[in-house]
Amino acid sequence: MAKTIEFDETARRKLLSGVNKLANAVKVTLGPKGRNVVIDKKFGSPTITKDGVTVAKEIELEDAIENMGAQMVKEVSTKTNDIAGDGTTTATILAQAIINEGLKNVTAGANPMALKHGIDKAVVVAVEEIKKHAIKINSKAEYANVATISANNDPEIGNLIAQAFDKVGKEGVITVDEAKSIETTLDIVEGMQFDRGYVSPYMVTDPEAMIATFNDPFILIYDKKIASMKDLLPVLEKIAQAGRPLVIIAEEVEGEALATIVVNTLRKTIQCVAVKAPGFGDRRKAMLEDIAILTGGQVISEDLGMKLENADVKMLGRAKKVVVDKENTTIIEGAGASKDIQGRVNQIKKQIEDTTSDYDREKLQERLAKLAGGVAVIHVGAATEVEMKEKKARVEDALSATRAAVEEGIVPGGGLTLLRAQDAVKALKLVGDEQTGANIILRALEEPIRMITSNAGLEGSVIVEQARARKGNEGFNALTMVWEDLIKAGVVDPAKVVRSALQNAASIGAMILTTEVTITDKPEPKDASGAGMGGMGGMGGMGGMGGMM
């Protein structure tokens, strides 16, 4: 296919146009007084949202080069969302400011590579400044503040998330679900969740929700593959006689064994679901042992001389309830002795202290959370489906932001932290176009506060100057329209969100500044041949050719 190649100023101007179209659609949502965006859907009702990444994901532009610019900025918001779960609008605004300011300088003759180096150096010191001022959070009120801000100043959502963290701890599992009523509620269930689902969809008990739910089941824990039915048959017969459901957790269930379980489940002879064991290698063995201790069962392991065909009901674990979906298994209220569980928890804590590997520490902390924490479920209720979707998205944002705040702490919100980071950038001593690159970041750092105040109906430049004149955490609260200590007022952002937004914006911004050529597919010409055929009607006169005979 033929390509269209654009160079220099023409290429950059079109990229900039695409960047601005996307960013202008996204930035109206920023701040407590940001506006909604209504997105048309081909099927069903339109989506109403104040979430930057949701808006960005919907945008596709007709012009190929403009669309490339838009897609690159879309990458900023999705990447920030993936890393920190929030801050997508801030990231987009920062990227737009860096690109607009940078391209002015490139057009004026600045060296794009030197600008990039200056931008990179400025971002490093700004990020260090953000980290330096981060405050660790531990209290329920602090969790509530972070979640409330991220949920567009909805204290109901903020308080629910704070309660969830308070109940299951920092490492606990918190999930978001749609409620059957208009009330938004929080349910706490003691239990363990791991990321493995059923091996066959024929095992579900609720075909509509595609989940298998068993009350008071036996749990068979086996560390090898189950392929032959003769190994499994003795246990299945004992379970069938007891008339109780069975959950099988094994390395793999396949072949004859899987076929027999599925057929008997469909015939309602037995209630059974098979799940692949979580983890790999030694970590899998350790996690199976965790499950065994939690449920009061034993890992049937050939390494210890046990055979599956000799397994007894006494070796099986028990739980009040087990819920299995396509991707996750949740064991609720395992029947294990609390002293055994506590002993296992202490053992894992000791391993966390002793390990030198960050990866191992992270995995051990995950195991600890699964064993010690519960499972919190936030049921989101609303009057209409449109409101439900919008509210659920806000709850998920707030949950991600709170997790980010737990990781790296909080900083003053309202764009103040980025503005305060200007001092560190000003202290940089650079020369030539590198200094110009640092100045681009200086200008970009004040853009979020400008936009927040602009969306609140005030002049951004005035608020920026007034904020500079004040010290510490004193900033402008766009919700109450007063100047106050933003930390005390609960106007806070997770440091991780602010940091990620700046880093991702600078990364894509610098890429666009150093772009010299764009190559796109040449649009195919509209097929005109079909339209011209109508004129052939005149060929009817060919009837007169009969006289030639």
UniProtKB/Swiss-Prot annotation:
Gene Ontology cellular-component annotations: cytoplasm
Main location as per UniProt: cytoplasm
Disulfide bonds: none
The EC number(s) this enzyme carries: 5.6.1.7
Binding, ATP: 29-32, 50, 86-90, 414, 477-479, 493
InterPro entries: Chaperonin_Cpn60_CS (IPR018370), Cpn60/GroEL (IPR001844), Cpn60/GroEL/TCP-1 (IPR002423), GroEL-like_apical_dom_sf (IPR027409), GROEL-like_equatorial_sf (IPR027413), TCP-1-like_intermed_sf (IPR027410)
Pfam families, per the entry: Cpn60_TCP1
Intracellular or extracellular location(s): Cytoplasm
GO biological process, one term: protein refolding
Keyword Lyase (UniProt): no
Enzyme class: isomerase
Biological role: Together with its co-chaperonin GroES, plays an essential role in assisting protein folding. The GroEL-GroES system forms a nano-cage that allows encapsulation of the non-native substrate proteins and provides a physical environment optimized to promote and accelerate protein folding.
Quaternary structure and interacting proteins, as annotated: Forms a cylinder of 14 subunits composed of two heptameric rings stacked back-to-back. Interacts with the co-chaperonin GroES.
Sequence similarity: Belongs to the chaperonin (HSP60) family.
Protein name: Chaperonin GroEL
Organism encoding this protein: Leptospira biflexa serovar Patoc (strain Patoc 1 / ATCC 23582 / Paris)
Taxonomic classification: Bacteria, Pseudomonadati, Spirochaetota, Spirochaetia, Leptospirales
